[in-house]
Amino acid sequence: MNMLILKLPKMFSQLWLLLILSLLTLEGPQPSTGSGYTTKSSVDLLENDSRYISYQDLMSTAKRFYDPETTWYSEMLFDVARNQVIVGARDTLYRMSFDLEPLERASWGATPSEIAMCQAKGQSERWCRNYVRVLHSYGENQLYACGTNAFQPSCSWRQMENLTVTGVDSGVVKCPFHPQANSTSLLQSNGQLFVGTATDFSGSDVAILRTGVESNKRFLRTKQYNNNWLSGAQFVGSFEAGHFVYFLLRESAAEHMSCGKVIYSRVARVCKNDVGGGGQLLRDNWTSFLKARLNCSLPGEYPYYFDEIQGMTYAESESILYATFRTSGSSIFGSAVCAYNLSSINAAFDGPFKQQEHSDAAWKTVNTNQRSQFQCGTSSIGHWLESSRYQLMDEAVQPIGAEPLYHSKLEQFGRLALDIINTKTEQVHVLFVASSGNHIKKLSVKYDGDGVQTCLVELWQADDTGTSSLLNMAYLKVSDSLYLGTDLALTRIPAQHCSRHVSQSSCLNSMDPYCGWNELVERCMPQPQDSSVLQHWHQAPQITCPVLNAPIDGGWSTWSPWAVCQQHEQPDSNCQCRQRSCNNPQPQHGGATCEGISTQVTNCTQHGGWTEWSAWSPCSQTCGIAVKIRRRTCGNPRPAFGGRTCVGSEQSEMYCRHLPPCPVAKPQSVDGGWGPWGEWSECSAQCGGGFRMRRRECNDPAPLNGGMECPGCRLDYEECNMQSCQEVRKLSAWTPWLTVTGSGNSSEPHMERRFRFVCRATSPDPSSVRIGLPKEESRNCHADGSCQRQVDHDSADSDAADWSPCSVSCGGGVQQRHRGRGSQSRVCNIHACPAEEQLSSNSLDNELEHGEWGCWSEWSACSVTCGLGLRRRTRRCLAGHDRLCQGRALEEQKCEMVPCEDFLGWSAWSEWSSCSSDGIRLRHRRCLVEQPGSMECRGAEFEKTACVPNECEETQTASTATLPIVIFVGLLFTVACCLATYRFTKKRFMLSAEEALNKTTTTTASFDTYPNQYSSLPTKDYYDQRPKRQSSFRMPAKTSNLGNGNGTLNRNNMHQNNTPKVLAKTYIDCESGTIKRQSALNNCRSNIDDEKF
């Protein structure tokens, strides 16, 4: 092999020689092949070449998918059975139709903790995401997907129909760590995954592996950190054929290390059934691994090598491998496409090996007989030893033909896709080659007995920005489309563009294997599927390279997008314009030019213009001051598309002269009309019948110019809350004790009685109050001043014991005596001690520790009529002296009246009006300030209240119809009261102060009425101090005839008669309740129904 070897010390001085030789090799005459064909070298295609299709024209039939939230469309998996394509992108999986319509989107991103860990290890934020790099179908409905996952590869099992995750697996050794790493993988139906990738974080440990898709499966790999096996390999692709799996890669050539670093393209092969070595020899390593160099070069005395493989595709039906190659980075850019028969690849693996015994030794050719392990046969220890020695084949794999199928200078080929199409007469392979500048070259390759013919059919501009990077390219036969995955979008481009050829000659001369002329419709079209139409569809008898020197009729490109353009001689006016060019294809060699316009203009700026003035209108009236008008419109032309509107007025007015004055018109009267009724007021009573009111105003309209007032009433009343009120009962206070037997002398034994009454009412009306039967209590009083309620004694005949000594000598003590089971107590030595404020523990307060308070009186009226004031209530100690009870006898409470500001500015309220027929009375006041401030004249001007319904009528009726009955009942009641008063007043009412204090009660009380566990009052009376609320009984004068039975008990309780006020309350009585005798607190009860009358 002839090689140009440059010694390192002379490299810079002889670099110019290398450049000259490279140019001579690329541009010199090409040798002929044995078949008589010559390989066409690439030509510089300009945009006026008939084979060039611009991005604008390409997108007219293409489909582009773009998602602003997604980038890096690196993987595609076609699922023909379900008419869908699975797309892997950054953090996302898509399920789409073949026309790139999204069917489902599944997010699959790395967790925040994984991203943080990735950045902590030194990686950039851009790459610390989950980039999908592996997509494989497994079984009938399973998808196996793997992603970089922020440099922590992860895999997942999903369903093909809805991308639902069914399982998760580690992606280490199955998926690369870095998104830009060159890797390849192949999944067999038995679940064995063959992978060529970097297996560590740094990307330095590159290997070819076999592992299972299930977890914890044993894997085989190339020997680690051994350059004879793999030396910095960059994987391009892989395919399976027969018992073998083949990997295409480029790596540093270990056999050329002594002369400097060189990149060679390789094909590596392993057996599918390789079980690996045993013991310490090739344990977990391949025993069938071999690799050979791929030769793609231009022949000559100094062959021009394209050493770096970039893309590959395998035609399984033809057993042909296609690959794209580039020159090394240190030489002039050049690219080529080479094809290899599988038989040529296997022949190289059947040849001798190239071995280097040690690092300083020269490489030599070696043959060995123990090769069964390389043919997927059985192996032994001896075979393992041979496998550990030999990996590199001595002979390179030679391409089909003596030179590349297609090559070009100053271009860089990348990925490769293949379609095999049957024309009307023969079979043609169509290659889609990605080139620099985001161009796609469509090449036709035809094999026959004489050799290979490769032709450039079309050149596509796949992107007009020049910023996107092609990540994946694949061809789908079902849709006859090429799919491009870039870092920005996903694009589907139809393989044929027949409609751009407008004549039969142009169609046939294009030599596009997808196109033919349909004479029925006279159009260039793809091959029809209907056999009856196929006979009218014509192609060239033989597909050759396009005829470039024949007349080519021009064809219009697609319209450009609408854009702003400027009108001629009007710098402030713009239009919307779009253009097309006659370059799809451009007419050449006398071909017909395009027919039609090349520019379209619309939506031009149009400034407004006035129309002519209209005729003057009639005067607005026939007398007085009037005007007439004329009009014009801005419609000649109307402003449009940003044009200026007309300047000036669209209406002109002029006074009408010489019109007679108009007579003065009398204003028309307007009768008043009622407005809507207002809301109903609150009811005047909660039960027993009340009234509520609503009002309306005569303001809809208000009477004007002498119009009539509104008929009817301004106010409206109705009854409310007609349900009956619940009857309320209350007890009156006990009357004072009245002497009923004896001579009236308090020093003699006598009997006393007292009474209380029950009042019932069903409404607040005083006339509804009814008085029930009285309740009475009796007690026996002795000559010593003590009294005792009547009770049966077991020892009635036993004499009372003497009084015990007084408990204290001063300050008030207690004496007790016992008779039978009863006992009595009285106060003694009540005169003050020398130091009364410091009573000892034997004082009256400690002796009478069970002194009880009476009930509180009613609250007094508030001390003020507006603002904040006080109200008071009092109570008396039932033991006879306030000092004998714990607590306060007076209690005060704050009370709040209406704010005093409400009276500012107002006059005094008027008297209440008479009751209306609706039972309502009113009063009013007026504001004394003409312009009141915010604090003056606040509140209502009128105030209303409800009267007792039909009070006057009932009173009149009672005074006439029932007068005899009232007189009779009054006389009968007076006679009864006189008889009772005669019996009660036989004894003197009042006692001296000392006797009152010494008067005690017995511990056991009895009543001459029925037994009752409640007693309204204690059985001891005190008269040392009169309360504020006096009993209605007064001390009888000696001249009083009360004891003679001349007293009168009436409703009004006239004091001059010295008769009790039945409903009056004493200071020891409760409003409505009783005191439980056995209760230590003497609680007041409100349920008077428990009093058994």
Curated annotation (Swiss-Prot):
Residue ranges, compositional bias (Low complexity) = 1041-1053
For this protein, the record's Pfam families field holds: PSI, Sema, TSP1_2, TSP_1
Q: Which InterPro entries match?
A: Plexin_repeat, PSI, Sema5C_Sema, Semap_dom, Semap_dom_sf, Semaphorin, TSP1_rpt, TSP1_rpt_sf
**Sequence ranges assigned to domain PSI in this UniProt record:** 497-546
State the UniProt keywords alphabetically: Cell membrane, Differentiation, Disulfide bond, Endosome, Glycoprotein, Membrane, Neurogenesis, Repeat, Signal, Transmembrane, Transmembrane helix
Q: Organism, per UniProt? A: Drosophila melanogaster (Fruit fly)
According to UniProt, the tissues expressing it are described as:
In egg chambers, high levels of expression in the follicle cells, with little to no expression in the germ cells (at protein level). In stage 3 to 7 egg chambers, planar polarized at the basal epithelial surface (at protein level).
Q: What GO cellular component is one of the record's annotations?
A: lateral plasma membrane
Membrane spanning stretches: 960-980
| Physiological role | Regulates the motility of migrating epithelial cells by providing guidance cues within the migratory environment and may also play a role in development of the olfactory system. May act as a positive axonal guidance cue. Function in neurons is essential for adult survival and is important for climbing behavior. Promotes collective migration of follicular epithelial cells in egg chambers, likely by acting at the leading edge of the basal epithelium cells to provide guidance cues across the cell boundary to the trailing edge of the cell ahead.
Which parts of this chain are annotated as the region Disordered? 1018-1056
Q: What is this protein called?
A: Semaphorin 5c
Q: Where in the cell is it found?
A: Apical cell membrane; Lateral cell membrane; Endosome
Which GO terms of the molecular function aspect are on file? Answer: chemorepellent activity; semaphorin receptor binding
S-S bridge residues = 118-128, 146-155, 271-376, 296-338, 619-656, 623-662, 634-646, 683-720, 687-725, 698-710, 862-895, 866-900, 877-885
**Which PANTHER family does this chain map to?**
SEMAPHORIN, SEMAPHORIN 5C, ISOFORM A
Report the family membership. Answer: Belongs to the semaphorin family.
Boundaries of every TSP type-1 domain copy: 553-605, 607-663, 671-726, 794-834, 850-901, 904-953
> What effect does gene inactivation have here?
Adults display a slight decrease in olfactory avoidance behavior towards the repellent odorant benzaldehyde. Also, the ellipsoid body in the brains of many mutants are decreased in size. No visible effects on development and mutants are viable. RNAi-mediated knockdown in the neurons of adult males significantly reduces survival to 37 percent. Adult survival begins to decrease from approximately day 9 post eclosion. Pan-neuronal or glutamatergic neuron-specific RNAi-mediated knockdown decreases adult climbing behavior.
Tell me where in this chain the Sema domain is found: 50-495
Q: Which domain of life is it from?
A: Eukaryota
**Which terms under GO biological process does the entry name?**
axon guidance; central complex development; embryonic development via the syncytial blastoderm; olfactory behavior; positive regulation of cell migration; semaphorin-plexin signaling pathway
The signal peptide, as residue positions, is 1-34
